């Protein structure tokens, strides 16, 4: 079966055809993750970081019903300011296309579209996971199942402490997804460098990670890899402070009956309010840090992929 291909920007089409290093970027951080203009400034800043480290950024979104890989400045501006843009997971893409909607793509949708476009490395803030109480609610992010079926390396700062981190790591093991921590043995928890849990593996250079990616795919596993990159020490928030703040935000969400797709945007906004903007600053820095590592991995991986082909 011939699979659908997203529409590539000219720069993206040329880069992929040439085997140049490319890093995919999600768009829900623009449409639902941050307020304007911080969302646009962050998106442009992250793209700049990727270019400075030798790779080409590929921001991914649905634009008026069309799957798009590589966006122009005016398109990023529209995503950043428009109010009617939906949030699309992998399961939502077909309906968004039928309706001609514009959508910010979640981690799972971005992974899917990156894979269809032939992009191997993806930088994001954090991934979804297994929610606390999932044994009753079955609330498990599609990000985890997509990692188990899509050959994309996802560079992130771990998961937020609102999730059941132990069960998230167990679920990734079930999905045969290697969890590799960069420069540490600890699995990070987004705003903090340590979650109290260990990652499966530690690798200390982008070149090692790229080689692990190459060998992983040569084994025919068909799964992605999760690269856990701790937030820079200078930007990390105190664990007790942020854990208490997150607990307060979750309590507020429960009292207001907010759940499902609306939950994460609400929590991010509420946490930013409760921390007086400190969580937003940390979020921006960790995304840029992940983009930097992702670009270096993509640069190291590109010649390995060319040799394989």
Curated annotation (Swiss-Prot):
GO biological process: nucleobase catabolic process
EC number: 4.2.1.70
Entry annotated with the keyword Hydrolase: yes
Catalytic residues as annotated in Swiss-Prot or TrEMBL: 26, 160
Short name of any one Pfam family annotated for the protein: Indigoidine_A
Family: Belongs to the pseudouridine-5'-phosphate glycosidase family.
Protein name, per record: Pseudouridine-5'-phosphate glycosidase 2
Source species of the chain: Rhizobium johnstonii (strain DSM 114642 / LMG 32736 / 3841)
